[in-house]
């Protein structure tokens, strides 16, 4: 058999088993664990290449072949890091395997036909579209910003730049829920809306879930009392929807122990569980040790840097409608920003005790930075703590799988949508993102939404080729018309689906009911299910997990930052 040297092979077909790939300009390296190809039988499109009639392309009918095949992509997902061809059919991932023409090639599991489009994945990393589960829907322009960062599902609440939305992730009341579902039809993004959950009696909460909310949100600015927590979780149990909570920073109606007791062992998603984004001061971070608590971070504290504390004070005053001239408001802001708990948050992510990362968009978080800040955190921990026990000095596969799970499969599991999205797995929506390794986590090269290309960096439309400047992200055909409504979904409660809101609201896009929201537990958070016994010193704010002091230095320089951005 003819041989080719490893570098030439990687240049032609992408890395193979044993090769390592650096993620952007971080100190993180991933190693190819498996390659589905058969050496010498790789398929590649182009002039003089393999995918031509009678060669790598068969004569099979369109019914028997995929709509699209992504060739030779390096898949990075929670379940592994493998090289494969990926077939897409009817907007879903159909096969992960070996593409080609079975009439002349061995081992083909994806038959390429005349009806098959090709996306070249050689030398690129393929991930699932990100899921941002903490969105303040303050402006619709957030959606394009998120999409072009690699996010394809947004969950949260809001009605636009209303004062309530600026502070809380709630879409309150059936009328607003209807309007937000109708507005969502225009965007190439899966959407789900959280209704206001702050009530001590269930009637209004029932009405909102039945109107189309996929879950409920408890926020301290609306009064997150033990009575409201208990009522909200009782309604959620009845409808199988998730509850997200921003707890009581001021400890007005109880302390963290009272809030945990009000949960009564029922599952809940705790937003910004460190506390800078809000929550019992100074010890809401303790919640990450409970089996029924699904803890997440928001990205302004990811990772801990020399600028984190100073930046947060001004952000908090604006977002929560506070007055710098009122001493009590300033004290409220000061109580939430603690360098000790923010530093501990870095380590708790690295240990897998914090399970998810989201944005808190325009309300102390940046909607386009969920992906890059996740990987900045992973990099900082690699530099400061060294390889994880499951990794080696050669590669960081386990750490990479742990961190990608934080914005893909785990928020999907937490909110009952993992049967549709959250991973590169057969049967799920083809919400996929391609990255050149040098730009991984920063600037995607292609965003595929429900099997259609929704956005990509594109050059001058009047140029003779696609690449001349100015190159910037633009919506592609998958973002327009009925292609847009046909390739994205809105997530709602089963009760809303049964009530027929699709017809009564005159919605075109597919509605999908969330499920298994009440049975998911911390142990189900993939690669992020550590439940330490947490202690916080009320005077010094020192944090301990299972008796170990958690502290680290702030970063002075980060990768995936000014090297890639002008602004």
Swiss-Prot record:
It is found in: Cytoplasm. Ni(2+) 2 binds at residues 217, 246, 272. Disulfide bonds: none annotated. Substrate binds at residue 219. The gene is ureC. Keywords: Cytoplasm, Hydrolase, Metal-binding, Nickel. It catalyses: urea + 2 H2O + H(+) = hydrogencarbonate + 2 NH4(+). GO terms for cellular component: cytoplasm. Binds 2 nickel ions per subunit. Its cofactor is Ni cation. Gene3D superfamilies: Metal-dependent hydrolases, Urease, subunit C, domain 1. InterPro entries: Amidohydro-rel, Metal-dep_hydrolase_composite, Metal_Hydrolase, Urease_alpha_N_dom, Urease_alpha_subunit, Urease_AS, Urease_asu, Urease_asu_c. It comes from Teredinibacter turnerae (strain ATCC 39867 / T7901). Ni(2+) 1 binds at residues 134, 136, 217, 360. Pfam families: Amidohydro_1, Urease_alpha. Residues 129-567 form the Urease domain. GO terms for biological process: urea catabolic process. The active site is at 320 (proton donor). The keyword Transcription regulation does not apply. PANTHER family: UREASE. The keyword Hydrolase applies. NCBIfam families: PRK13206.1 (NF009685), PRK13207.1 (NF009686), urease_alph (TIGR01792). One of its GO terms (molecular function) is nickel cation binding. This is Urease subunit alpha. Belongs to the metallo-dependent hydrolases superfamily. Urease alpha subunit family. Heterotrimer of UreA (gamma), UreB (beta) and UreC (alpha) subunits. Three heterotrimers associate to form the active enzyme. CDD domains: Urease_alpha (cd00375). It is an enzyme of class 3 (hydrolase).
């Amino acid at each position: 058999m003819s041989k080719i040297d490893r570098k030439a092979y990687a240049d032609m077909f992408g890395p193979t088993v044993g090769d390592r790939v650096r993620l952007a300009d971080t100190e993180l390296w991933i190693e190819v664990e498996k390659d589905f190809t058969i050496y010498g039988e790789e398929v590649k499109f182009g002039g003089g290449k393999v995918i031509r009639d009678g060669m790598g392309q068969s004569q099979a009918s369109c019914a028997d072949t995929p709509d699209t095949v992504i060739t030779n992509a390096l898949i990075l997902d929670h379940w592994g890091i493998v090289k494969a061809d990926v077939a897409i059919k009817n907007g879903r991932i159909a096969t992960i395997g070996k593409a080609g023409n079975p009439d002349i090639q061995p081992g083909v599991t994806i038959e390429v036909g005349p009806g098959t489009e090709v996306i070249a994945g050689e030398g690129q990393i393929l991930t699932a579209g990100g899921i941002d589960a903490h969105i303040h829907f303050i402006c619709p322009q957030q959606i394009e910003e998120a999409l072009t960062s690699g996010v394809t599902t947004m969950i949260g609440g809001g009605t636009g730049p209303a004062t309530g939305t600026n502070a809380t992730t709630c879409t309150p009341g059936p009328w607003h829920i209807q309007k937000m579902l109708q507005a969502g039809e225009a965007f190439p993004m899966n959407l789900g809306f959280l209704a206001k959950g702050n009530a001590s009696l269930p009637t209004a909460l029932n009405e909102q879930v039945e109107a189309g909310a996929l879950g409920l949100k408890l926020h301290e600015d609306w009064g997150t009392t033990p009575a409201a927590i208990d009522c909200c979780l009782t309604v959620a149990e009845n409808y199988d929807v998730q509850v997200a909570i921003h707890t009581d920073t001021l400890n007005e109606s109880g302390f963290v122990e009272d809030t945990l007791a009000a949960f009564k062992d029922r599952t809940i998603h705790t937003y910004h569980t460190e506390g800078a984004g809000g929550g019992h001061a100074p010890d809401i971070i303790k919640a990450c040790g409970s089996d029924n608590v699904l803890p997440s971070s928001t990205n302004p504290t990811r990772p801990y840097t020399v600028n984190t504390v100073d930046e947060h004070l001004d952000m908090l005053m604006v977002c929560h409608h506070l007055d710098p001239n009122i001493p009590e408001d300033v004290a409220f802001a000061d109580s939430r920003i603690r360098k000790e708990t923010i530093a501990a948050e870095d380590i708790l992510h690295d240990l897998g005790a914090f399970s998810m990362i989201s944005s808190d968009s325009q309300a102390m978080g940046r909607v386009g930075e969920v992906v890059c800040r996740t990987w900045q955190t992973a990099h900082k921990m690699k530099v400061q703590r060294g390889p994880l026990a499951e990794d080696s000095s050669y590669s960081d596969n386990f750490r990479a799988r742990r961190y990608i799970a934080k914005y893909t499969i785990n928020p999907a599991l937490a909110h009952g949508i993992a049967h549709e999205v959250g991973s590169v797995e057969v049967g799920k929506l083809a919400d996929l993102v391609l990255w050149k390794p040098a730009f991984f986590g920063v600037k995607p090269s292609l965003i595929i939404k429900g099997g259609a290309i929704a956005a990509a960096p594109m050059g001058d439309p009047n140029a003779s080729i696609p690449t001349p400047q100015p190159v910037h992200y633009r919506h592609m055909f998958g973002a327009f018309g009925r292609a847009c409504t046909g390739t994205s979904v809105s997530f709602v409660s089963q009760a809303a689906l049964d009530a027929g809101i699709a017809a009564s609201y005159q919605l075109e896009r597919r509605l999908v009911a969330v499920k298994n929201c009440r049975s998911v537990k911390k142990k189900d958070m993939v690669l992020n299910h550590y439940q330490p016994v947490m202690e916080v010193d009320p005077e010094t704010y020192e944090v301990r997990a299972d008796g170990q002091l958690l502290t680290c230095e702030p970063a002075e320089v980060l990768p995936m930052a000014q090297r890639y951005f002008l602004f």
